[in-house]
């Protein structure tokens, strides 16, 4: 509980937004804090507030929108609580969970604890990686919980009944005009977050492979706008709109108008899913694409580049 902090996103000295984070590691006199990237995105400076109400300036070591993880650091000779890391893999559906955070108004409701269960595992949820648009362009594999999660909880720990962190709360589904939704919150599995955090702490570049194409989902209304037709028997996949010169796609033989049906035997249902599968690979890996070109299926091998 005492390892949880309020994260303050400041721009020009003015508070823009608040979220939650937690101290997860200490090395010598350096403490490391984990939070969501979207909590600190756009900040010119970041502060954290501890459970003893002490406020500290922190350094942003790194992060990115696809992992939605950011790592902060500060130096201190004082002793602060460090969260115990658990296992999302060992968590079972129905297990008790606790979310700790600073929902809604961090000045009033900081360090609120809510209780729920693990409602599901390995949920594939579409997300937007840009604050400029709400359209989904990526997919995250997450834990599902019915523990109450509200604005401001983002970046806080989702814990098991032993108080060990099994995930980082990062989003919830909300009601709209067509559906009434309650108790559907999500958390990034702690194993994924720690793996990313260690890369940041070790000074590794966070680079992701690229095909070097622009694309549209087959279901997109944009295909009609660009006067692009696909074979009637092709109902899933993404259409290649353009191929960059010198790109991995061009080297591997992808052409404008090709429809990507599968990547490494995984059926491609959207460009968001294709990107998710692509980013599971490293630069230099070879992938296998099944495509439809002018009504005929074809298999291509492509070596991934930056």
Residue ranges and their predicted role:
Residues 5-7, 21, 31-35, 58, ...:
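Terminal peptide-recognition signature
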Residues 13-15, 43-46, 80, 100-115, ...:
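Active-site loop architecture of trypsin-fold serine endopeptidases
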Residues 1-26, 33, 44-45, 69, ...:
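N-terminal activation segment of mature serine protease catalytic domains
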Residues 59-60, 73, 160-162, 195-306:
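C-terminal recognition in membrane/secretory proteostasis and scaffolding
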Residues 8-32, 54-59, 82-84, 110-113, ...:
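A conserved glycine-rich beta-strand in the N-terminal activation segment of trypsin-fold
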Residues 7, 45-52, 99-101, 285-291:
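Short conserved beta-strand and strand-loop elements enriched in small hydrophobics
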Residues 22-23, 59-61, 78-107, 188, ...:
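Active-site substrate-binding loop(s) of clan PA
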Residues 28-68, 74-79:
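Catalytic-histidine neighborhood of serine endopeptidases
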């Amino acid at each position: 509980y005492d390892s949880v902090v309020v994260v303050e996103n400041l721009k020009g000295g003015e508070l823009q937004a608040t979220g939650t984070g937690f101290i997860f590691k200490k090395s010598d006199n350096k403490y490391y804090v984990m939070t969501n990237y979207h909590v600190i995105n756009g900040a010119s400076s970041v502060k954290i507030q501890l459970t003893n109400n002490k406020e500290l300036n922190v350094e942003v070591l790194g992060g990115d929108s696809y992992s939605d993880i950011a790592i902060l650091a500060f130096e201190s000779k004082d002793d602060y609580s460090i969260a115990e890391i658990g296992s999302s893999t060992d968590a079972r559906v129905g297990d008790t969970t606790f979310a700790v955070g600073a929902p809604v108004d961090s000045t009033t409701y900081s360090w609120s604890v809510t209780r729920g269960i693990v409602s599901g595992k390995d949920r594939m949820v579409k997300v937007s990686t840009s604050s400029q648009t709400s359209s989904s362009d990526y997919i995250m594999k997450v834990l599902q919980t019915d523990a109450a999660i509200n604005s401001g909880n983002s970046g806080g720990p989702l814990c098991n009944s032993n108080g060990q962190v099994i995930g980082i709360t990062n989003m919830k589904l909300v009601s709209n005009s067509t559906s009434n939704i309650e108790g559907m919150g999500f958390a990034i599995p702690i194993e994924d977050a720690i793996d990313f955090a260690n890369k940041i702490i070790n000074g590794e570049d966070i680079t992701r492979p690229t095909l070097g194409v622009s694309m549209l989902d087959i279901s997109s209304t944009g295909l009609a706008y660009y006067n692009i037709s696909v074979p009637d028997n092709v109902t899933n996949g993404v259409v290649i709109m353009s191929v960059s010169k010198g790109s991995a796609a061009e080297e591997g033989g992808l052409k404008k108008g090709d429809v990507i049906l599968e990547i490494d035997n995984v059926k491609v249902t959207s460009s968001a899913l294709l990107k998710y599968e692509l980013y599971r690979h490293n630069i230099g890996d070879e992938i296998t694409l099944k495509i439809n070109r002018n009504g005929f299926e074809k298999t291509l091998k492509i070596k991934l580049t930056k």
